[in-house]
Curated annotation (Swiss-Prot):
One of its GO terms (biological process) is pyridoxine biosynthetic process. NCBIfam families: pdxH, PRK05679.1. This is Pyridoxine/pyridoxamine 5'-phosphate oxidase. Keywords: Flavoprotein, FMN, Oxidoreductase, Pyridoxine biosynthesis. SUPFAM superfamilies: FMN-binding split barrel. Catalyzes the oxidation of either pyridoxine 5'-phosphate (PNP) or pyridoxamine 5'-phosphate (PMP) into pyridoxal 5'-phosphate (PLP). InterPro entries: Pyridox_Oxase, Pyridox_Oxase_CS, Pyridox_Oxase_N, Pyridoxamine_oxidase_dimer_C, Split_barrel_FMN-bd. Substrate binds at residues 68, 125, 129, 193-195. It comes from the Bacteria. GO terms for molecular function: FMN binding; pyridoxamine phosphate oxidase activity. Its EC number is 1.4.3.5. It catalyses: pyridoxamine 5'-phosphate + O2 + H2O = pyridoxal 5'-phosphate + H2O2 + NH4(+); pyridoxine 5'-phosphate + O2 = pyridoxal 5'-phosphate + H2O2. Homodimer.
């Protein structure tokens, strides 16, 4: 095991804009700016985000998912309703997200309420997925035990015979969720761990944001 005391402390600031992000007055515009920069600098998946939910016993779960859209209403991702995350969100529609862009030494933390996307939204996104991914969505019983990789490949092949010609429809148990933030925190690395942290807070969607500077 690596001795954490042997790791050299980072004392220089690397990538990122020189603009003072602490002057931002609204979080979504700032997120858009940071995400655009991350899209240019991250080696892969700048839209990857850690999604945290809580089960019936209050035990948290976290996993990486891909953000598939965002706007002033929130951040959207897709998955199976019967998955562990889907069941936990159905029982407790609150979640936290974390974007970590290592190339920029930045992270964005988000907390908020979760609502399902509309069928029209889910259909539109599903239609953009590669056909093999669409077939996989039909074949997968996400979060359930799987006998073997071969069994999964057989299930995909079986589904494929049903959709040799034409479009693959969205499975009824596959959809998306939108996380509408009530908290958005922007963190940027600074030398000697004297980082910058700005949090935007509001009581509910549609309410005005309050900006607070936080100790690192």
């Amino acid at each position: 095991m690596t001795d954490p005391t042997s790791i050299k402390h980072q004392t220089t600031l690397t990538s990122g804009t020189s603009a003072d992000f602490t002057q931002a007055g609204e979080p979504f515009a700032l997120f858009a700016e940071w995400f655009a920069e991350a899209s240019k600098s991250e080696p892969n998946d700048p839209n990857a985000m850690a999604l945290s939910t809580v089960d019936a016993d209050g035990l948290p779960d976290v996993r990486m998912v891909l953000m598939k859209g965002y706007d002033a209403d929130g951040f959207v991702f897709y998955s199976h309703k019967a998955s562990q995350k889907g069941q936990e969100l159905a029982a407790n529609p609150k979640a936290a997200l974390l974007f970590h862009w290592k190339s920029l030494r930045r992270q964005v933390r988000i907390r908020g309420l979760v609502t399902p996307v509309t069928d029209a939204e889910a259909d539109a996104y599903f239609a953009t997925r590669p056909k093999q991914a669409q077939l996989g969505a039909w074949a997968s019983k996400q979060s359930q035990p799987l006998e073997s990789r071969f069994a999964f490949e057989q299930a995909i092949a079986k589904v494929a015979t049903q959709y040799i010609i034409g479009e693959v429809p969205r499975p009824p148990g596959w959809s998306g969720w939108r996380i509408t933030p009530v908290r958005m925190e922007f963190w940027h690395d600074r030398p000697f761990r004297l980082h910058d942290r700005i949090e935007f807070r509001r009581e509910a969607a549609g309410q005005p944001w309050t900006k607070v500077r936080m100790y690192p």
